Amino acid sequence: MRRGAPQDQELVGPGPPGRGSRGAPPPLGPVVPVLVFPPDLVFRADQRSGPRQLLTLYNPTGTALRFRVLCTAPAKYTVFDAEGYVKPQSCIDIVIRHVAPIPSHYDVQDRFRIELSEEGAEGRVVGRKDITSILRAPAYPLELQGQPDPAPRPGPPAGTPPPTARHFQEHPRQQLATSSFLLFLLTGIVSVAFLLLPLPDELGSQLPQVLHVSLGQKLVAAYVLGLLTMVFLRT
């Protein structure tokens, strides 16, 4: 088939020879709208179950109609239920399968024709509609399809910084912990020293008067020492 010129090809389908071919006269009498969905057929060459489409044909009238599916390239397609009847105010699904999904057929436009006629062997055609069909190439090369994806390498947990950043973060934390420990230790030593110093009115002390502490200072030192003890016990 020549690309882009499906109108130059003869429509072939079931039925007597010559019926529904190129140059067929328009339907006589009342015209029935041919309602189909989708309006165009797009096949994908990489469909897992094979390139196929479901065409739904509606009959909006109050009488049963005979339908027939014609195609410009019948060798490339298989049409299930290419001819039959549609009940009044009902619909029927027609499965169309592309049987030649080869690279030379990619982006080649074909044409289907849906004809509706009255019941009976010689029923006159009351409506027809042409729809285009095209085969799209696979989204990925065929040689890459079917191959399992390589197993992803296990990475660090979410929220975990890279090793370099983590290395720089651990050092400040260690330094902060060391500084806090030294501060607590120094505060504890000072508190113990305050508790060991004599009161101002204590007799027999050989320390100078400046090293005598009040009872309030001893209470504060005891309170601070108790807090430090609780911190050490929790850690």
UniProtKB/Swiss-Prot annotation:
Q: Which residues are in the MSP domain?
A: 33-145
A single Pfam family, by name?
Motile_Sperm
Query: Where is this chain's protein located in or outside the cell?
Result: Membrane
Secretion signal, residue range per the UniProt entry: none
Keyword Transport, does the record have it? no
Which named protein is this? Motile sperm domain-containing protein 3
Q: Which UniProt keyword terms apply here?
A: Membrane, Transmembrane, Transmembrane helix
Output the lineage of the source organism.
Answer: Eukaryota, Metazoa, Chordata, Craniata, Vertebrata
Q: Which residues cross the membrane?
A: 180-200, 213-233
Which intervals of the chain are annotated as region Disordered? 1-25, 143-171
